[in-house]
Design a protein with these regions (language model features):
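FIC/Doc superfamily catalytic core
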Residues: 1-211
Length: 211
């Protein structure tokens, strides 16, 4: 399909409103889906709570409160499954951030997202890494992506964001919009400013940017 045909087909769509409970379910699907990057699965307790949130029985803040109480009890009996703990809390906080009506195209907001998601999970939540690292990827034949130099993480992100702020998407066709967003997302992710949680943080940052 040519760019002209693609733009034309997009313009032919009629906007419809998505029911609120469907939006809630989509937010949870995204939040839990992002945990699969680290092979994390939610607990049965979160699966119950999220359904109560989708149907409107509990707010997202009540869900987090219930989860914290649940894990305090688990900790006292030494029964915490830590992978589920991380998945449950981070998924819930992703949904919380998706519901927040705020966004700032800035390095500080990237730090804010990471700190918000991973407080109580990582002691370095919201802090840029101070060491360089590599990670062997099977998809790259055990080679590593060239992640950002730890000395210039803030500058690298600020540079990418500065370029993004100069773009006028109203002047671009749909193909160019998609290509530009893809490139921006990839550049942010490749910097990999945190020791852990980069993919989830970048994905949520871009999602908030696009809303």
């Amino acid at each position: 399909m040519s760019e002209k045909e693609l733009d034309s087909s997009v313009n032919n769509y009629v906007e419809t409103k998505t029911p609120k409970n469907n939006i809630k379910q989509q937010e949870w699907d995204m939040a839990i889906g992002l945990q699969e990057v680290d092979n994390l699965k939610p607990s049965k307790y979160l699966e119950k709570l999220l359904q109560e949130n989708v149907t409107g029985e509990k707010t997202i803040y009540e869900v987090e409160h219930e989860l914290k109480r649940y894990y305090v009890e688990k900790d006292q009996s030494d029964e915490i499954v830590w992978d589920e703990f991380e998945c449950d809390l981070v998924s819930t906080r992703i949904v919380e951030l998706l519901e927040e009506d705020n966004f700032e195209l800035s390095v500080d907001y990237i730090k804010y997202i990471h700190k918000f998601l991973f407080k109580d999970v990582y002691e370095f939540a919201g802090e840029f890494r101070k060491v360089d690292f590599s990670k062997h990827e099977r998809i790259l034949y055990n080679d590593s992506v060239a992640y950002g130099d730890c000395r210039f993480l803030e500058q690298s992100l600020d540079y990418d964001i500065s370029l993004e702020k100069m773009k006028n998407y109203k002047e671009l066709n749909m193909v160019d919009v998609i290509n530009n967003i893809t490139s921006f997302s990839s550049n942010l992710w490749q910097v990999h400013p945190f020791r852990e949680g980069n993919t989830k943080t970048t994905a949520l940052f871009i999602e908030k940017y696009l809303i």
